[in-house]
Amino acid sequence: MNFSESERLQQLSNEYILGGVNSPSRSYKAVGGGAPVVMKEGHGAYLYDVDGNKFIDYLQAYGPIITGHAHPHITKAIQEQAAKGVLFGTPTELEIEFSKKLRDAIPSLEKIRFVNSGTEAVMTTIRVARAYTKRNKIIKFAGSYHGHSDLVLVAAGSGPSQLGSPDSAGVPESVAREVITVPFNDINAYKEAIEFWGDEIAAVLVEPIVGNFGMVMPQPGFLEEVNEISHSNGTLVIYDEVITAFRFHYGAAQDLLGVIPDLTAFGKIVGGGLPIGGYGGRQDIMEQVAPLGPAYQAGTMAGNPLSMKAGIALLEVLEQDGVYEKLDSLGQQLEEGLLKLIEKHNITATINRIYGSLTLYFTDEKVTHYDQVEHSDGEAFGKFFKLMLNQGINLAPSKFEAWFLTTEHTEEDIKQTLKAADYAFSQMK
């Protein structure tokens, strides 16, 4: 494929935009470098770049675009609302309608508030939990990404009894001292942290199904024990469902797994492609938030009518019969095809799949923990990524990320993807 115009625009972008990208994950640093492809438009399962190349897209904006690009129903809703106004700074009926649809789908959201991103949603749930418990420390699990606010950019200490250290320049040590990081799926480490820190722990922050070191399910009983241990300690359980809400079924992962948190943060998919975030949970906890309580959260753009309208339209698409069954079927076809090719070419790789989402890891281990992904073969992934890209398959440029199917992918797309993977693997021996 020819990428000359992307390369020219990336050079121009470097003159005006820091690093040439507005989010570091868009660079190709993790896959050996080079100019990232500059996209021009998207329709359904496909993206088209500035050089005229067409791609089958499995990045899907890192997850939000579950109905494909420029879905007609959602696009029409956005256009209609834009003609009526995009921001009023007042309540609208759309906020009520969208909140009701969300609570009908996720019953634990007894009360809801909207913000503008997943980062804001998680940041605010932590504040609310601290206000409710009158404690300061939180526990999170290694490898899970909860946005770019200071409190969650903290690396693990040497064990559950050790405090974290800043995972980014600009995060104060004083903030890092409020965070304990333990391995996901390691209930003994979680018990040790709770026993050591006791009544200092306000909340534990959990991705019920991990989406940020690939797709990783909780081990049987893990989430149930986290709930039990937390509540016996007076610690709240916060689920970060920014990736998982409406990803696997019409609702949240918590309902699929049958384990209910005290608070939930959500975002990505529910905005229909527009910026959105939100949080909700038990009414008595949510009543800590202003104007009813002392925990302050506000936002000029929060609950804006354009995002509300897009979210309503998105849910109208997802609540139709057969949507998630199709995603699961296509995901199964993709997984089975890749596994056959891995065996055919004697590639060291494994796959985690959850319905219409999967991750290909260049390792010989079944992945259940972050450390396994960290030690997987990044060089092999980088080579695979570029071999696929040059055949018109767009993946996330990181070994830690997932492939996302949409309602608009087809069996023919899967066949073309497997044909490309067959060639890519043949070049990796």
From Swiss-Prot:
It is found in: Cytoplasm. Pfam families: Aminotran_3. CDD domains: OAT_like. The modification N6-(pyridoxal phosphate)lysine is found at residue 268. Pathway: Porphyrin-containing compound metabolism; protoporphyrin-IX biosynthesis; 5-aminolevulinate from L-glutamyl-tRNA(Glu): step 2/2. It is an enzyme of class 5 (isomerase). InterPro entries: 4pyrrol_synth_GluAld_NH2Trfase, Aminotrans_3, Aminotrans_3_PPA_site, PyrdxlP-dep_Trfase, PyrdxlP-dep_Trfase_major, PyrdxlP-dep_Trfase_small. The keyword Hydrolase does not apply. GO terms for molecular function: glutamate-1-semialdehyde 2,1-aminomutase activity; pyridoxal phosphate binding; transaminase activity. Its cofactor is pyridoxal 5'-phosphate. Its EC number is 5.4.3.8. Keywords: Cytoplasm, Isomerase, Porphyrin biosynthesis, Pyridoxal phosphate. GO terms for cellular component: cytoplasm. The keyword Cytoplasm applies. It catalyses: (S)-4-amino-5-oxopentanoate = 5-aminolevulinate. GO terms for biological process: protoporphyrinogen IX biosynthetic process. Homodimer. HAMAP family: HemL_aminotrans_3 (MF_00375). Belongs to the class-III pyridoxal-phosphate-dependent aminotransferase family. HemL subfamily. This is Glutamate-1-semialdehyde 2,1-aminomutase 2. It comes from Staphylococcus aureus (strain MRSA252).
